[in-house]
Amino acid sequence: MHSRTRAAFPLFAILLSALALRAWGLTWGLPTATHYFSYHPDESVVLGAAMGMNAFTGHLLPGFYHYGSLQLYLVNFANSLAFVFGGVNTVIKDLAQDHAQWARLYLIGRSLTVAMGVGTVWVTYALGRRLWGHGAGLWAAGVLAVTPLHAQQSHWLTVDVPAAFWGALALLWTAKTDDALRGDAPGRLAWRYALGAGVFAGLASATKYNMALSILPLLMIGVLERQTKILLVGLASALAAFLLACPGAALDTRTFAADVRYEWVHVSREPGPTFADTGNGFVYAVTHTLSAGLGLPLLLLALLSLGYAAVRRARGDGLLAAFALPYFCVISLASVRYARYAVPLLPLTALWCGRLLADWTAPRPHSLFVLRVSAAAAVLALTLADCVVLVRPMAQTDPRDRALAWLGQAPTPTTVGFAAQPWFGTPPLSPYFALPKPGGWRRFAPPGQPTHLDANGRQWSLTVPGADWDTAVLTHNSPHYVVLSEYDYRDALRLHDARALAFLSALRRGYAPAAVFTGPPPLFRRHGSIDGLPTQDLPHDMLYPNPAILIYEQRK
């Protein structure tokens, strides 16, 4: 018993570390008296769709299928359960008065993501142990626990980390199926494990549609082993689980088809300014997404581990590759290339790294064991440091809030202008700026020149362009201050947008820099600049907690 406890201690420590990294800063960007919506632009969409359902009134379909429905149901259930026990009020009538209750709904959904993120670390250990032994499982769990992208994305009420959780479970049950088929009694257990693998693959695709690819390893095993029953059980259970977790696919077919088609067209053909001219998708995924998401030391280790897998070509390598290769191709061929799309690959990356580290650090005569372990520990320590630096801004005052506080000290009356339509990346001079749809805040602004009365009784006059980078904001309205967000200018300047360049030229003639708000970049990344404005070398959706905010003041 004592030996079992001692053997379990490293895993417990890894899971505790994973929890700490994912819960640290969990309240970042939640609604407050100054902004009624999360600073993460997708969270309000997910929460709104989830809380739009009501089991007590028979409204059981979300009517929203841009994401799969499973996570919406889980968030709705968690918040409804909290309501039953008096932890939260799910009926929000006035955001100005009920913003604290609204924030709790977000927080409950985020806590669910944290649990699934930590759960993925455990599943990664279990899968690594089954494929390559206890040591490989521990190393793999340790790698995923400190992977920067996974830790960051596990903070948010979104679908990527939950989808990766279900996908990892599908792989674990597929590995069990494979072991059972090659064991002493393949007929007894294999089909049961195949049933579980299919169910988890169906739940993964009911969370995020492209996770339907997680059924491929099971199908590969069924074909290679010539097990028709495995194929049929896996496909049938996956389809049944998908329809149970996303019933709108069968009961609200027209809306479901329209939303899925919209996402297909958007992701495959409409890169927008954010991803325009970003080069080859396969190269971008490595040099931009994984470079930032893993950190340089872990990226190098991951590339080495892939080479090692290509040499070893063990059965487990084929199992992982059956999902990893098609999925990597899908996200690399897409026109929209958010870093979060790579999250389902992170457990597999950790597994390959874990196997390499386990073999690398295995005791051997005359093998420089201490040096090998020290090198492996150094990679994890550097990755942990990178993870901490990436997550830390969520535990600090957000640059948007710091900019708002700075403007709050300005003399009154104050007119503030913007280069582009204010949204989630803008200091909340209106508490409605971060509404899910850009420009939605105007519905809550008085007619004529928009104004906002803040919590301290200060009235802001807001000068907002009819079109982004309209120099009339400066030449006709002459606001006292002009606010720029990194989300406004980063891609516009990268693409040499003539309107943006003209606006900045006019801005510099009439205005002087007054304040800059940002935080430190992650390790192995750097602060850069475009046309003299600060930028951070991070993917678009990894920058949410820490965009640079610039304030210019009218020259005297």
Predicted regions and their residues:
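Transmembrane-helix signature of polytopic, membrane-embedded enzymes
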Residues: F9, A13-I14, A18, G87-Q97, ...
